[in-house]
């Protein structure tokens, strides 16, 4: 079978449409620059040599590789073509002359057009700019307001700048700034004023995070909002976050960067950032700003660039809507200002890919504040119109209220509508108490009721569910509910807000509370109408998703629509249109292949079996396989020693047969190779002809379309002619009736019969003329039909490819084109004839009218000859009408035939496409080996990446082992220190037991303490088994020192001092206990203070609740508020302040006690050090000491 596949592949390779160079120079004449060419029929027809060179070397191009490619040149014909290397900005094109000189733009010079001429500067896409010194000396422009150099002697201002010197802002703008691409900043003023100027009351203020002490309130989150670890580097004074997965992690800014940042508009946000490892490809979501329901984002770098690895770089972003700031989506001016007014989130991407780490430092947001200092001229001061006040016209003036409270400072201010012309609350519009008309008493309505505007003394319940308050719109007297729950809107809170669905009142079915639409994050959060507000069906799915909840992929796409990363959601099916079912792929992206195709994308021909043309090859290969198996059997017998001398003879014979068969196969292959080359040439020729036929068929199709259009025009004109003839017939009938009823008196009106006869003859002549025109039109239609049929027949012959040579094909095509041109001319002639017939018919109609007028003037004429002549004219008109009807039918048949011919032409075109598809299948088989090699390369790359990851993990493990080793060594060092301390404790314990054996009761306490120390040391020895030997040595040392009691007199005093210190320790212990007791008491007092504070806060909440109640406030309510405030102040002064003073005093005393304890501990440590020095100075050995007392 392997040999069979090899034969198949060999056959496919021999069919490739390229001709290898042969010894005949007339085949591939490529000037030594290529060894491949292909036959081109059109080139052969034009030049007589039909071979076109392929894959020209040495940067050459042309039919015979005779010239250099675009952007290359050479000094002589046989030289290599060298690159021009023309500068992309300074040259007019990529080409150059034979010397390598590029064509330069104005003001540019150099062989490569890469530098400016003297007197010019700044090379740009438009060339070099002339120096200012070369310009008009009167050109005096403000550099902050011009958009470019003053080349023409006049200043070219930025869009928001005006003035002869570009030194003034246009009306509605302020603050001329050189860094502003618009020149000046538009007045904001919340949209209430277009007049403003720079404020002198604000100074520059920078909101920064330098991370010198800690993370400064920053956090780290994943894309889905889950928290991530954020680390602070004490060494580098920055923060960083790492990720093991590809999902990105973001730095989240603290509250000081959020909130109302209006004064930062037009200023910069900058930070230092670096990334280690990872993908390092910037994305559109690197920096994200959110606020007021809007979101904008920007990449760290331009698309196509890569973030530097391990290098800290400062990134700066301008906070405005100008396209140069690279924020997307691009907001309007007021949308951007609205976002900055309520900035709710600032996120900076930290990681890029797996095992990525991002570092951030020196975050700076340029802002301003109303204090003295360096001026901030970008802050505006508005000139407010009537009804507004404040620096930014953000407040309503006295006597005005907010028209729409939900818009906040963006809402318009309108006059108060209080009875008596009184003032009102600027935000709610409620009239102040005492400002109403004193003659009318208004009822004080509770929550859930409102004043009837027609009867202010009565209260009506609000038409709101759940007892929500309401108010009356002054203009329309409409009752509107206030404070609807989240997700609910409408005048009666009866509708779900945008982004929510349900039916709060059950007006269209069962009651369903409003809930957020579940579209699986597959809609644009900034868009409106993402889902149906009643059913919740998602209407604007993005990321190629579909379904009720955007939880499915659209037809022709696959992937996970619920993936958090948009790049991992639905992707287009990458299926071969030739080998796959249209518009279908499976959930894993694999395509549904047609029969005979395979592979993930159905782009590989399925190699289940060879085509039918290889059956003979398969039979021959089966025979060779059988012979090979018999040879193997003979060899096995020969190796086994069986069969005597007969086997070698048979083996040799079979080998000779095999060699002969191989020679035959080789000869056949060589013959087949020549045949295959001829087939390849013919295939290339057939492809070229196929392209020509396809082009000509397209021309025929266009011609048929034009003929159809002309036919429609002719049909319309024939219908017009028929209509005119009908009108003529009616006119003639009327004339005949008049003639029949006319009596002519010879004495009054005598008209000779010759006059009527001449009129009748003229009418007859006109009718004959129309008949001839109709016959001519019919003949033209028949000729058009014949020519179209001939063209269709010839097209069929051409596409079938049978029955003639290339020259015959060429002649046939030329004949077909001639017929086509003749058909076009006939169509034009037909159009002219139809137009002429139309004109003639109209003339006849007008003449008939004149005849009718003449006849109407004849009163009482009774001439039988006139009646006969009129009947003859009518018959002539009837025959003309019948002829026109037949002509119309003929045109209809031609039009129908044109439709059929178009259908047949389309079928022929589809046949050509099918043949082209067969050729593409052969090419796809030839590319199979290449695809397999690419797959092997991909597998090799994957293996390399896996090995690299393993190496990285091993290195990290090595570092961890080194860290653990260092910790173990440190623990071993501490172990020796602990052992030494245990030995010292045991030594001192033995000394205390020997020296204080007959001490007084005061020293007994020290002995007990030493015993306890011995017990502690014994427990430590049990825990550390390796210290038993040292404990024994310590015991031996204690026995040796027992014999030198005389030398311990001085040490006795030290031990007494130690006992005294222990007594002090006990005293300090009591002091500590006292401190603990006092701390507990302080905690109790703090708890009591907390209760008091909570009571005070409850009182304040109650006061604020009373203040927030709608409606007017009477004097009694004001007195209750004042009493509540007085009680709260009294409670704070009488209870909280003494408690705070007492707590501060106790904290001071505790600090003093701690200081005393630290001093005592230092003294004890010094005594221990002194004892250690005494012990070290004692001489070793045994001594015969005297008893302390003589008996």
UniProtKB/Swiss-Prot annotation:
Residues spanned by motif Cell attachment site: 586-588
Ranges of residues in domain Laminin IV type A: 213-381
Gene Ontology CC annotations of this record: basement membrane; collagen-containing extracellular matrix; extracellular region; laminin-5 complex
Domain Laminin EGF-like: 28-83, 84-130, 139-186, 187-196, 382-415, 416-461, 462-516, 517-572, 573-602
Effect ascribed to mutating residue 442 to S: 20-fold reduction to fibulin-2 binding
Region (Domain II and I): 603-1191
CDD domains to which the protein is assigned, alphabetical: EGF_Lam
Phenotype upon changing residue 206 to A: No fibulin-1C binding. No change to fibulin-2 binding
Keywords of the record: Basement membrane, Cell adhesion, Coiled coil, Disulfide bond, Extracellular matrix, Glycoprotein, Heparin-binding, Laminin EGF-like domain, Proteoglycan, Repeat, Secreted, Signal
Keyword Ribonucleoprotein belongs to the record: no
Molecular function (Gene Ontology), one example: heparin binding
The record's note on its domains: The alpha-helical domains I and II are thought to interact with other laminin chains to form a coiled coil structure.
Function: Binding to cells via a high affinity receptor, laminin is thought to mediate the attachment, migration and organization of cells into tissues during embryonic development by interacting with other extracellular matrix components.
Quaternary structure, from the entry: Laminin is a complex glycoprotein, consisting of three different polypeptide chains (alpha, beta, gamma), which are bound to each other by disulfide bonds into a cross-shaped molecule comprising one long and three short arms with globules at each end. Gamma-2 is a subunit of laminin-5 (laminin-332 or epiligrin/kalinin/nicein). Binds to fibulin-1, fibulin-1c, fibulin-2 and nidogen.
Protein name as annotated: Laminin subunit gamma-2
Organism listed in the record: Mus musculus (Mouse)
Underlying gene: Lamc2
């Amino acid at each position: 079978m392997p040999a069979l596949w090899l034969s198949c592949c060999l056959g496919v390779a021999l069919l490739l449409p390229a001709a290898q160079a042969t010894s005949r120079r007339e085949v591939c004449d490529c000037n030594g620059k290529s060894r491949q060419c292909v036959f081109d029929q059109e080139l052969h027809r034009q030049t007589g040599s039909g071979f076109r060179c392929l894959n020209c070397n040495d940067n050459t191009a042309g039919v015979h590789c005779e010239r250099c490619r675009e952007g290359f040149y050479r000094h002589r014909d046989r030289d290599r073509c060298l690159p021009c290397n023309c500068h992309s900005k300074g040259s007019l094109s990529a080409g150059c002359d034979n010397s390598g000189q590029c064509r330069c733009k104005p003001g540019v010079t150099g062989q490569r057009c890469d530098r400016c001429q003297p007197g010019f500067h700044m090379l740009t896409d438009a060339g070099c700019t002339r120096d200012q010194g070369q310009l008009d000396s009167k050109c005096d422009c403000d550099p902050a307001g011009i958009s470019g150099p003053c080349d023409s002697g006049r200043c070219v201002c930025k869009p928001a700048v005006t003035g002869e010197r570009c030194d003034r802002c246009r009306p509605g703008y302020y603050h001329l700034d050189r860094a502003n691409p618009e020149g000046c900043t538009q007045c904001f003023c919340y949209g209430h004023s277009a007049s403003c100027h720079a404020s002198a009351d604000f100074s520059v203020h920078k909101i920064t995070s330098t991370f010198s002490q800690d993370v400064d309130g920053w956090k780290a989150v994943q894309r889905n909002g889950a928290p991530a670890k954020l680390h602070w580097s004490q060494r580098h004074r920055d923060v960083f976050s790492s990720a093991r997965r590809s999902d990105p992690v973001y730095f989240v800014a603290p509250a000081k960067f959020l909130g109302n940042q209006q004064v930062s508009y037009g200023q910069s946000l900058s930070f230092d950032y670096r990334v280690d490892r990872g993908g390092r490809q910037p994305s559109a979501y690197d920096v994200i700003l959110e606020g007021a329901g809007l979101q904008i984002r920007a990449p760290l770098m331009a698309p196509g660039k890569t973030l530097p690895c391990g290098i800290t770089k400062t990134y700066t972003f301008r906070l405005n809507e100008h396209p140069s700031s690279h924020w997307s989506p691009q907001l309007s001016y007021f949308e951007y200002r609205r976002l900055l007014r309520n900035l709710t989130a600032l996120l900076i991407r930290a990681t890029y890919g797996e095992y990525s780490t991002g570092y951030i430092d020196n975050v700076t947001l340029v802002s301003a504040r109303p204090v003295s200092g360096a001026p901030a001229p970008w802050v505006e001061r508005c000139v407010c119109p009537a009804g507004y006040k404040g620096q930014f016209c953000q407040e309503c003036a006295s006597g005005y209220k907010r028209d729409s409270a939900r818009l906040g400072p963006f809402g318009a201010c309108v006059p108060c509508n209080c009875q008596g012309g009184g003032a009102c609350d600027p935000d709610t519009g409620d009239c102040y108490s005492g400002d109403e008309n004193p003659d009318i008493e208004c009822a004080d309505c509770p929550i859930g009721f409102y004043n009837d505007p027609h009867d202010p003394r009565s209260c009506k319940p609000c038409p709101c569910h759940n007892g929500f308050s309401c108010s009356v719109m002054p203009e329309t007297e409409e009752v509107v509910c206030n404070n609807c729950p989240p997700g609910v809107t409408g005048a009666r809170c009866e509708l779900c807000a945008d982004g929510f669905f349900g039916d709060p009142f059950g007006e269209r079915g069962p009651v369903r509370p409003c809930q957020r639409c579940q579209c699986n994050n597959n809609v644009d959060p900034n868009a409106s109408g993402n889902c149906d507000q009643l059913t919740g069906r998602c209407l604007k799915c993005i990321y190629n998703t579909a379904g009720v909840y955007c939880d499915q992929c659209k037809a022709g796409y696959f992937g996970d629509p619920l993936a958090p990363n948009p790049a991992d959601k639905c992707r287009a099916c990458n299926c071969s249109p030739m080998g796959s079912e249209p518009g279908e792929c499976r959930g894993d992206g694999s395509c549904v292949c047609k029969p005979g195709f395979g592979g993930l994308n159905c782009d590989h021909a399925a190699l289940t079996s060879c085509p039918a043309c290889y059956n003979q090859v398969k039979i021959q290969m089966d025979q060779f396989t059988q012979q090979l198996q018999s040879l193997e059997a003979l060899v096995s017998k020969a190796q086994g020693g069986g069969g005597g001398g007969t086997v070698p003879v048979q083996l040799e014979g079979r080998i000779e047969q095999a060699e002969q068969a191989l020679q035959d196969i080789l000869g056949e292959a060589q013959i087949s190779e020549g045949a295959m080359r001829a087939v390849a040439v013919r295939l290339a020729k057939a492809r070229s002809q196929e392209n020509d036929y396809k082009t000509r068929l397209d021309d025929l199709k266009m011609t048929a379309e034009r003929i159809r259009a002309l036919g429609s025009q002719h049909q319309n004109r024939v219908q017009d002619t028929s209509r005119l003839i009908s009108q003529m017939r009616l006119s003639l009938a009327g004339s005949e009736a008049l003639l029949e009823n006319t009596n002519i008196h010879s004495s009054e009106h005598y008209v000779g019969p010759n006059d009527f006869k001449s009129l009748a003859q003229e009418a007859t002549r006109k009718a004959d003329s129309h008949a001839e025109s109709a016959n001519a039109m019919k003949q033209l239609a028949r000729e058009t039909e014949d020519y179209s049929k001939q063209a269709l027949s010839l097209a069929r012959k051409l596409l079938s490819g049978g029955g003639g040579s290339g020259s015959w094909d060429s002649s046939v095509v030329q004949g077909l084109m001639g017929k086509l041109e003749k058909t076009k001319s006939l169509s034009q002639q037909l159009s002219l004839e139809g137009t002429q017939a139309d004109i003639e018919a109209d003339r006849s109609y007008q003449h008939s009218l004149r005849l009718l007028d003449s006849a109407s003037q004849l009163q009482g004429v009774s001439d039988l000859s006139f009646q006969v002549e009129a009947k003859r004219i009518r018959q002539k008109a009837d025959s003309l009408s019948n002829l026109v009807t037949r002509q119309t039918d003929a045109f209809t048949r031609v039009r129908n035939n044109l439709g059929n011919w178009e259908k047949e032409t389309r079928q022929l075109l589809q046949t050509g496409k099918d043949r082209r598809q067969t050729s593409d299948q052969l090419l796809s088989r030839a590319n199979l080996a290449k695809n397999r090699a690419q797959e092997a390369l991909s597998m090799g790359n994957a293996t390399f990446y896996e090995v690299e990851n393993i190496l990285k993990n091993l290195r990290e493990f090595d570092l961890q082992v080194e860290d653990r080793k260092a910790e173990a060594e440190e623990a071993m060092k501490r172990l020796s220190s602990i052992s030494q301390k245990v030995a010292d404790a045991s030594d001192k314990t033995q000394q205390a037991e020997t020296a204080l054996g007959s001490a007084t009761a005061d020293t007994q306490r020290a002995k007990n303490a030493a015993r306890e120390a011995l017990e502690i040391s014994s427990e430590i020895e049990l825990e550390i088994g390796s210290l038993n030997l040292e404990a024994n040595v310590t015991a031996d040392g204690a026995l040796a020192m027992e014999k030198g009691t005389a030398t311990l007199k001085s040490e006795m005093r030290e031990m007494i001092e130690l006992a005294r210190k222990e007594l002090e320790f006990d005293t300090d212990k009591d002091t500590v206990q006292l401190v603990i007791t006092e701390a507990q008491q302080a905690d109790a007092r703090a708890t009591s203070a907390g209760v008091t504070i909570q009571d005070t806060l409850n009182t304040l909440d109650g006061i604020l609740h009373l203040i927030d109640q709608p409606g007017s406030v009477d004097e009694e309510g004001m007195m209750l508020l004042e009493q509540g405030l007085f009680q709260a102040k009294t409670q704070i002064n009488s209870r909280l302040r003494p408690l705070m003073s007492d707590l501060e005093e106790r904290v001071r005393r505790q600090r003093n006690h701690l200081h005393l304890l630290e001093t005592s501990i230092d003294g004890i440590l010094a005594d221990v050090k002194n004892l250690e020095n005494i012990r070290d100075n004692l001489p070793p050995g045994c001594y015969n000491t005297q008893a302390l007392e003589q008996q």
